[in-house]
Amino acid sequence: MKRTIFLILAVAVLASCASESGRQYANRAEAIAAQMRDPASKYVVVACHRGDWRNFPENSIPAIESVIRMGADIMELDLKLTKDSVLVLSHDANVLRCTNFTKVFGKDKSPKIKDLTYEEIQQLNLKRAHDIATDTVKMPTLRQALACCKDRICVNVDQGYEFYDMVLAITEELGVTDQILIKGKKSIGEVAAHEAKYEHNMMYMPIVDIQKEKGLALYNSYKEQGVVPMAYEVCWGQSNGDFEKIAAEIVASGSKIWVNTIWASLCGGIGHDDDEAYMHENKGDVYDYFLDNGVSMIQSDRPAQLIEYLKSIGRHNL
């Protein structure tokens, strides 16, 4: 019965996307990707940092299912490679924080993912945010995660550019390449040369730390060479006018802006993050700063809160 209800809701959302946008899309992920690529779109794309980690183990299938059902647009996930070359979802290089590794293997075995086989990792149970191990939730492979996300939500592969070739092989096999976003800090030339090897590539977005020398240099290289990416992920730690200036330039260039409200250190300092918004009755006291500066993609640690606010102002209706 629950599955039927979820399917009905999914169909209703998809039908709404088609009617409101004036275009027909094969699935919700395709509709989201279209908004991501459209610099004129006023739709604000919501990305979920490691999924719904407040209620389920981070980077897990239940955490992914939860954000899909709440109406999020992008599932952000992290990748690591096992000893036997299986891509799994993990932010950390080892499994100590997120699994019951010590209980299963003791202290004599290396907890690094690169030292563990996939079979060994499957003996572990993932932990909830409160450090309590689940009974059945395992660390998923990238293939399993993408199969869950396929056509339902777009995916941002974080900490994954080094595995580009492996990731692309999986996305091509599953038919989801156009639904996947990968980001990085490599030069324009490096990215262009690497992607030239393939006929079909994932979406790419440069990360620019505008208050750091290398990050600002990367941003300036795009501007000076006249290269207009789909969007920039902009990071900055102090509100001193730097962001406002560069945001105006980005919007004028025909690109989009992605910001991270997960931590204040990434979005202008204290008073600008999701936890600050949580303390305000009017979430616009925090989020409107970004919207007023042309931001149309936000990675959040409180996606339900952000989605509710965006819907209330007509900025999250496909």
Where are these regions (language model features)?
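Phosphate-group recognition and catalysis centered on beta-loop-alpha active-site segments
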Residues: 17-318
